[in-house]
Amino acid sequence: MIDETSQALRDFSQRYCDLWQQKSGHAPASQELYGIPSPCVMATDEDEVWWQPRPFTLAPNLDAVERALDIRLQPAVTAFYTSQFAGDMTGTLDGRPLSLVQVWSEDDFIRVQENLIGHLVMKRRLKQSPTLFIATTDSELEVISVCNVSGEVILEQLGTKKRQVIASSIENLLIALQPLIINCSN
């Protein structure tokens, strides 16, 4: 499951970067990540950074999250967050836009783990089954998460028990996800 998830993420990343190249003539670009150090940075101009995915250089685990909550995480979630450094990538699944949360740098990896811990603590306080977010949506009240019990990818409404299965696994989500370029500059 780990290798399959990592490969599916690499494949989606390649499709995403290829689309950027096709539409703009250059690698993915981001204004939000401008000025933030990362091994992904290829070049910068006056207000944006051009980037490409890079190999993950830290220990490939989410041990800090597991220790903080005394929980074993779905191996696919660990693979998703520890396969590469990259900027967040947008795509559509069945017409629904989403943005995959990615790790931009070693420092960002700490922030992502802290946010995962916060999300799991919230789920525990609400007496809900544990989930781990992997993508955002246009709505601040909904996220794309992985059910830590089943491994299914779900659209969940934060603070409620409302959830909808959208893929049987992260791998299947990434295979079905179509790259989407939101702001493409030439």
Curated annotation (Swiss-Prot):
Keyword Cell inner membrane: yes
CDD domains: Syd
Alphabetical UniProt keywords: Cell inner membrane, Cell membrane, Membrane
GO CC field: cytoplasmic side of plasma membrane
Main location: membrane
Family indicated by similarity: Belongs to the Syd family.
HAMAP family documented for this protein: Syd
Name of protein: Protein Syd
Species whose genome carries this gene: Erwinia tasmaniensis (strain DSM 17950 / CFBP 7177 / CIP 109463 / NCPPB 4357 / Et1/99)
